[in-house]
Amino acid sequence: MEKRERHFVLVHGACHGAWCWYKVTTFLRSAGHKVTALDLAAAGANGKRLDELNSISDYHEPLMKFMTSLVAGEKVILVAHSLGGVSVSVAMERFPQKISVAVFVSAYMPGPDFNLSTVYQELHQRRQGASKDTQYTFDRGSNNPPTSIIFSPEDLAAKLYQLSPPEDLTLATTLMRPTKLFRGENLLKETTVTREKYGTVRRVYIVCDKDNILKEDFQRWMIKNNPSDEVKVIMGSDHMPMFSKPLDLCAYLQEIVESYS
């Protein structure tokens, strides 16, 4: 029986862009699927500047515009990596009828009873995330919280890409852009999700067991507090499975789409 084409929508994490999915995009297209890898605002090749982003809604606007553009009856598979999980969660809340399944790949996964502030606080308490080598910008002065972040070459090599091919690390150091940091009540309001909408979309979480920035115990803590329909594990993957274990990631994505589409 001929396989039906599915449409994967790939959403990158902080400081990255659509470029980070080049291996996954190539593999899925060669398998007969349609793939859209998006650049969020002021990321990748997107033309926006950081100072044009006033809220996290501005940041994930390209994904929301894309979801709005889908024709009636069309459903996509949303794949989120890292910080992309926040944008995908909001898309699930706004467009549940347009999503067949959402896949969180070592990604932030807030939920109806588990907001983004709780996720960030737990990450901070575990002393995970970016290190002292990370480069921050303080556009509102050094007495105020930082306004943007970009991973240092040291963080990339030790925490994100430690098991990835060196040429992909070089690619990242060439193409990365800073990510705006959003805070306050508006952040929580704009990322709130509900059981009635977000909760109706099926979710799969893919754990990366050798992730040095969102460690496995933190990933499983999110899953425990906001259970997904299924959990898969990529063994021997750093934070960037699209580089360190691209075939394993693509195999899982194809399994998921067969089960949930």
Swiss-Prot record:
| Lineage, broadest ranks | Eukaryota, Viridiplantae, Streptophyta, Embryophyta, Tracheophyta
Q: Which residues form the active site?
A: S82 (acyl-ester intermediate), D211 (charge relay system), H239 (charge relay system)
Function, please? Methylesterase that catalyzes the hydrolysis of methyl jasmonate (MeJA) into jasmonate (JA). Can also use methyl salicylate (MeSA) as substrate with a lower efficiency.
PANTHER family assigned to the protein according to its UniProt record, in alphabetical order: METHYL JASMONATE ESTERASE 1 (PTHR10992:SF1066), METHYLESTERASE FAMILY MEMBER (PTHR10992)
How is this protein induced?
By cold and UV-B.
Protein's organism? Vitis vinifera
- Which Pfam families does the record match to this protein? Abhydrolase_6
Organism superkingdom: Eukaryota
- Enzyme Commission number(s) from the entry: 3.1.1.-
What does the record give as its pathway?
Plant hormone biosynthesis; Lipid metabolism; oxylipin biosynthesis
Domain called AB hydrolase-1: residue spans: 8-251
Catalysed conversion reaction: methyl (-)-jasmonate + H2O = jasmonate + methanol + H(+); methyl salicylate + H2O = salicylate + methanol + H(+)
Record-given protein name: Methyl jasmonate esterase 1
Does the keyword tRNA-binding belong to this entry? Answer: no
InterPro entries in UniProt: AB_hydrolase_1, AB_hydrolase_fold, MES/HNL
| Gene name of the record | MJE1
Subunit relationships: Homodimer.
Task: List the GO biological process terms.
Answer: jasmonic acid metabolic process; oxylipin biosynthetic process; response to cold; response to UV-B; salicylic acid metabolic process
Family statement drawn from the similarity comment of this UniProt entry: Belongs to the AB hydrolase superfamily. Methylesterase family.
Q: Which UniProt keywords apply?
A: Hydrolase
Q: Name one GO molecular function term.
A: methyl indole-3-acetate esterase activity
